[in-house]
């Protein structure tokens, strides 16, 4: 950046130099470490007591002090872990995985030691095969051959035995598969029953027919028609 001078006024040159120095100093100060007030002065945002300074040169001198440096360390010590967590979540996950991998052998070893100490008895394994144990010899049964005459008698008895009768289910299935033909009288009785029911007559349970109260009859007959003989 170049400055253009007008005339030979040394005071103007000093003002320009001071402004240039102030711009250079301000470029090295982060925005979150200093605040510019309305009256043109500067306040330090790092120190807890918020000192107010008149010029950038005074702010630069304050920033070089021990109190400001200690406050700066505390400020970034609290702020940096949060930034790292927000910016690098993947890195944090990788570090956790590495820690778990490093601790895994120790955990497995301690787990095995505790299990072996608690379980004194051998573990049951379902894949193990049962060892062969010779069975105790039972009472010997003499299988003497039968004479040929007895063999013939036994075979004759077996051939003469009748076959077992079929159960009730088989009889029912036979009757269902082959229904008996209906007689004419039975058919007439069934037709008469259906006509009475369709006309509005209902049986009272005593062998008589009674008019249904919910049905309207055309005639005033109190007795149902008789069963036709033909």
From Swiss-Prot:
Domain of life: Eukaryota
Alphabetized Pfam families for the sequence: SCNM1_acidic, zf-SCNM1
Motif Bipartite nuclear localization signal: positions: 4-20
Region (Required for interaction with LUC7L2): 188-230
Keyword field: Ciliopathy, Disease variant, Isopeptide bond, Metal-binding, mRNA processing, mRNA splicing, Nucleus, Phosphoprotein, Spliceosome, Ubl conjugation, Zinc, Zinc-finger
Sequence ranges of Basic and acidic residues compositional bias: 81-102, 205-214
Subunit and partners: Component of the minor spliceosome, which splices U12-type introns. Within this complex, interacts with RNF113A, as well as with SF3B1/SF3b155, SF3B2/SF3b145, SF3B3/SF3b130 and CDC5L. May interact with LUC7L2 and SNRNP70.
Pathology noted in the entry: Orofaciodigital syndrome 19: A form of orofaciodigital syndrome, a group of heterogeneous disorders characterized by malformations of the oral cavity, face and digits, and associated phenotypic abnormalities that lead to the delineation of various subtypes. OFD19 is an autosomal recessive form characterized by tongue nodules, dental and digital anomalies, narrow high-arched or cleft palate, and retrognathia. Some patients have notching of the upper or lower lip.
Name the record gives this protein: Sodium channel modifier 1
Species this protein is from: Homo sapiens
């Amino acid at each position: 950046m170049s400055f253009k001078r007008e005339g030979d006024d040394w005071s103007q040159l000093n003002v320009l130099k001071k402004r240039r120095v102030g711009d250079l100093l301000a470029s090295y100060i982060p925005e979150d470490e200093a605040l510019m007030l309305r009256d043109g002065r500067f306040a330090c945002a790092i120190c807890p007591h918020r000192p107010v300074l008149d010029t950038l040169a005074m702010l630069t001198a304050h920033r070089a002090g021990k109190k400001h440096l200690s406050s700066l360390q505390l400020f970034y010590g609290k702020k940096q872990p949060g930034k790292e967590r927000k910016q690098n979540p993947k890195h944090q996950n990788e570090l956790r995985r590495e820690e778990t991998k490093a601790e895994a052998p120790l955990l497995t070893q301690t787990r095995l030691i505790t299990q072996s100490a608690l379980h004194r008895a051998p573990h049951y394994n379902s894949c193990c095969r049962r060892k062969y144990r010779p069975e105790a010899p039972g009472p010997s049964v003499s299988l003497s051959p039968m004479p040929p005459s007895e063999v013939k008698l036994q075979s004759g008895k077996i051939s003469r035995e009748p076959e077992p009768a079929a159960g009730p289910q088989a009889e029912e299935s036979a009757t269902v598969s082959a229904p008996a033909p209906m007689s004419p009288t039975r058919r007439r009785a069934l037709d008469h029953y259906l006509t009475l029911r369709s006309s509005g007559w209902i049986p009272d349970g005593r062998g008589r027919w009674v008019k249904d109260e919910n049905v309207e009859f055309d005639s005033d007959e109190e007795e149902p028609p008789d069963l036709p003989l033909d």
